A protein has these predicted regions:
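Short catalytic/metal-binding and nucleic-acid-binding patches
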Residues: 1-173
Length: 173
């Protein structure tokens, strides 16, 4: 059945812009009901690709988590490139790696641009807690698909329970 969008759907992207230094909380998924992004080969490929795009000066990944069926990132744009274009590069380069595993990306993505002065801590915490809240590991364990930039980890780690979540964080929704 074709998706039918209500009035105003096409206007959602009007007025959107991307500029150097803007921070975006991004989420993109595998097509449902696929899983497998956390397989070691695929996890390594995902990390290599976000590093490659960083080295190409498209973005700086501040923190990210790779889950079995989706991925969350907090990025800072580093080039005059639309965020959607960077995501297309990312997903496009990874498509060839996913194909032999019979995996493919969902077409769309979620993005939220952080406003100037908006506290990034809630996004860092959300990304950090994602595998714990999904029940994929216990509070005292570390998730292999989690990444935090070294500079950001210096301050964020001090707000954790020695690199793992405080029990009360897991109770927050």
């Amino acid at each position: 059945m074709a998706k039918v969008h209500g009035p105003g759907y096409s206007a959602l992207s009007k007025g959107r812009y991307s500029s150097i230094g803007e921070q975006y909380f991004l989420t993109f998924n595998l097509a449902r009901p696929q899983t497998g992004l956390t397989e070691p080969e695929l996890l390594a490929a995902v990390r290599r690709e976000w590093v490659r795009l960083g080295e190409a000066r498209h973005w700086e990944v501040r923190t990210a988590v790779v889950m079995p069926d989706h991925l969350h990132l907090l990025v800072r744009l580093r080039a005059e490139t639309e965020v959607g274009d960077v995501i297309r590069l990312f997903k496009g380069h990874l498509a060839a790696v996913l194909r032999p595993h019979r995996l493919n990306w969902q077409r769309s993505f979620y993005d939220h641009r952080l406003r100037h002065g908006e506290d990034a801590f809630p996004v860092f915490r959300y990304i950090f807690l994602n595998p714990y809240r999904a029940g994929l590991l216990a509070a005292g364990e570390s998730w292999p698909g989690y990444f935090c930039d070294a500079e950001d980890w210096e301050w964020f780690r001090t707000l954790t329970d020695e690199g793992t979540p405080f029990p009360e964080w897991l109770e927050l929704r």
